[in-house]
Amino acid sequence: MEKFQGYLEFDGARQQSFLYPLFFREYIYVLAYDHGLNRLNRNRSIFLENADYDKKYSSLIVKRSILRMYEQNRLIIPTKDLNQNPFFGHTNIFYYQIISVLFAVIVEIPFSLRLGSYFEGKKFKKSYNLQSIHSIFPFLEDKLSHFNYVLDVLIPYPIHLEILVQILRYWVKDASSLHFFRFCLYEYCNWKNFDIKKKCILNPRFFLFLYNSHVCEYESIFFFLRKRSSHLRSTSYEVLFERILFYGKVQHFLKVFVNNFPAIPGLLTDPFLHYVRYHGKCILATKDTPLLMNKWKFFFVYLWQCYFSVWFQSQKVNINQLSKDNLEFLGYLSSLRLNPLVVRSQMLENSFIIDNVRIKLDSKIPISSIILSLAKDKFCNVLGHPISKATWTDSSDSDILNRFVRICRNISHYYSGSSKKKNLYRIKYILRLCCVKTLARKHKSTVRAFLKRLGSGLLEEFLTGEDQVLSLIFPRSYYASKRLYRVRIWYLDILYLNDLVNHE
């Protein structure tokens, strides 16, 4: 990053007015595709790596793309000729792919620099651990046990294209960049009307930026109203949110919207309120009455409909009572469970028993959805009965075994925080038997004959790292008992959702 520091450090006026000329600088393309820079950056979300585009990158293509942008008429492409008229051996869509990647990099440069100045001087002890998905569950266990209602909101997307352009106008004062941005968006809408694969049009990084800028706009308004509604500020957990670099814009948006909300929304006053956003959704946890939760619900509906011009239905906002309903959160089903706790106390010579009720957050595995995901990938049928993986029979035995072991260990690693391991053991059983059936099918044998020939040592490969560690830490009697059945482990190295969570 220091290599490009001289190019990226602008003063206030230049940073606001000279973004468009960066499209014609070759070093920006190097910044977008350089692997070394991506590895040096600690925040992987700022500069995403894309192997597909690295294969196509070359300085010759960059120069041709720059010349093409100089000739503005060459960028105006009839929709019927998207895949025709190749320019120097490449289709017209390919150059829009390059531009989309470049635009995402250019607009992220001010954000990345602003993020560094935002956290400058602030000390975060082991903040890299807070990037783990599992790091948020201990926080929820500590906080949600004192709450009774959770508002589950599905953030609407997509929105009108002009709204996206208006959002960027708050911090980008370069009219040329905005016009160029609007031109690319509307060209993309024209492509959607034709038979073109989505993944070959624009880079996902481009849409990730659009989505986060849109969500940041919504959250800036929400946080502003939240601070205005109560004098007590809740603890900040910004580092737990996805794409934290966009939270540097919050203070900027507060100045913009301060004149639009002169009155304090007293109806929404609640000092005990926690907000978490994840995977296109957000939850609002509080200890309130159903009346106030319904007010928050319609607040979100009116905010999206009136300000963002999005038809947002109230059915997308669910009010869950934690003691009765299950909250689907990051692949887990969470709910509050009342555990009776009996304590025997003795005062002088008289002893008495005190019955206490302890509230505990119970996290379970959504076995039904996971079985549907396994059935979709041909590991089992919809009833959960294991079947052979026919598409893997052409691989070697070691390759097949390593694939199943890796999947089994990843699932066990992700769902190690489940309060009950029964469903996890069922998933392991499905994968083990599917592996045996796949190997037996490859060797044209039955499952019983195949196991008899190889022995039970084959299944020992599925012994997960958690089982090995726990067997060394705990005594054998404790390890074999039912107490270990309830042990919950949260790991701080899980940065991505498990593939089975994205079954929809």
Swiss-Prot record:
Top-level taxon of the source organism: Eukaryota
UniProt GO MF annotations: RNA binding
GO terms (BP aspect): mRNA processing; RNA splicing; tRNA processing
Localisation: Plastid, Chloroplast
Keywords attached to this entry: Chloroplast, mRNA processing, Plastid, RNA-binding, tRNA processing
Primary subcellular site in the record, as a coarse category: plastid
Function: Usually encoded in the trnK tRNA gene intron. Probably assists in splicing its own and other chloroplast group II introns.
Similarity remark: Belongs to the intron maturase 2 family. MatK subfamily.
Cellular component terms per the entry's GO annotation: chloroplast
Pfam families membership: Intron_maturas2, MatK_N
Name of the protein described by the UniProt record: Maturase K
